[in-house]
Amino acid sequence: MVVASDSGRLAVILNRAEEIVPDPGTILETRGDLVLASVSGHSVPDHPRTAAFNLVEVAGSRVTVTSWDGMAVRRIELSPGVHMIAHHDLDDPRTARISRWLPEFAEQSRTELGSLSQSAWHERWIGVLARSAELGPADDESIIRDNRAHGYPTLSLLTCLAEVSADAVSFESAALPTPGAWSDPTFSPG
């Protein structure tokens, strides 16, 4: 995640399930450059030389998801509301944690968030994360992940809260004391 708080931009990149495996010996560029370019106002090229990804870009009130599957770049502008994305498509029911938790996040958002204090908004969403962690970090429905059981050396490392307006980004993060294991977060300004 990269934040440009002065320009109201935020970008998050997620690894995407590879639909086309690159040829052996192919040298791929880092996906990290894409988030840096995004917060500077640059678009993803039509044929990135990276592994597959989903890039979430926030610029003021506009939110876009750009996906690269190794064959084509797709861009979707999000409608207002609650959405989830992981290693497949936006709001994709193929992802167990999206099927399980998207309705609960949406339910927690039914009260007009603008009428809630910042701490109340945070508590609702952190509560959903905590409930998901009760399943265990290797469970397909869990949001806080330890994917080593599935053959991937990836673990959840932190929890972030971001609020974006037309002119600024407010960002807080909390590192998980033990990667892949939930604990009550203590947030610090980013």
Residue spans of the language-model regions?
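N-terminal nucleophile
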Residues: 1-190
